[in-house]
Amino acid sequence: MTNSNNTIDSAPIGLLTGKVVLITGASRGIGAAAARLFAREGAAVVLAARSADALARIVTEVRADGGVADAVALDLADRASVRAAVDRVEELHGRLDGAFNNGAVGQQQPGPLDTTTDEDIDEQFAVNFRSHWTAMNAEAAVMRRNGGGAIVNTSSIGSRRANPALPAYAAMKRALNSITETAAVSWARDGIRVNGITPGGTATEMIDAWEAATPGVVDRITASTPLGRMAEPREIAEAAAWLLSDRASMVTGAMVPVDGGAGA
């Protein structure tokens, strides 16, 4: 069915049937959309985020639709919490086939490089870079024990160019691109594929917060997107689902734009 934004809700095809997939940042936005989509595509999903209530609602929804879902508490700024979340997946299912490292935090104060606070930089480093480094290593360790797997990291269109409005956010996302590509090369021999996606403007709570801090940003993003609209979270999740699936078996080390042409 085509909705008012001209997006298409495709019928599931079993893209992830039989796979166990961890999703971070799963309580809202792209992560919540991925939880629903991956489960419909046949994956057993483990959802991780700080908001236990939001995760519980999504788990209930997925199970009501006949899917397999569990939740685990996760604080991306806490390395022990990140490792514990990955360990919990192995406890629940005995393996980990795919990981969608999607959790992130927006920059508290959008603005020029010279006004970005130390606190903002520290938070961006801990959540948008170090957490992924920690998660990827923990995930790869489990995957090696079971013959391999696939990892997808959510970066941003803002990582691909100068970003005066969100300098700390963009810098950490660009660093994430680097370790994504490095992990792809380093772990290929273990049967682990590692890719990233770089979404453009997407209709999420993070964009809502940015709009509140900088009125007019949604209109500017929309105007700069050749397809003429913001992405829906599910559209970003669709790209991640394909990269996690066996249909992307020869794809590793890629940073895939999902931006409506804005980065072209």
Please place each PLM-identified region on the residue numbering.
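Active-site helix of classical SDR
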Residues: M136, M172, T180
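Catalytic Tyr-X3-Lys loop
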Residues: D114-T134, G148, V152, L176, ...
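The beta1-alpha1 cofactor-binding region of Rossmann-like NAD(H)/NADP(H)-dependent oxidoreductases
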Residues: D53, A73-A85, D118
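Alpha-helical segment proximal to the catalytic Tyr-Lys
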Residues: A141, V185-R189, S249
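Conserved mid-core segment of classical short-chain dehydrogenase/reductases
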Residues: R83, G106-D122, R145, A165-A168, ...
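Conserved glycine-rich cofactor-binding loop
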Residues: V20, S27-G29
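C-terminal substrate-recognition "lid" of short-chain dehydrogenase/reductases
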Residues: W133, R229-V258, G263
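Residue(s) in the substrate-gating loop at a strand-loop-helix junction
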Residues: S156
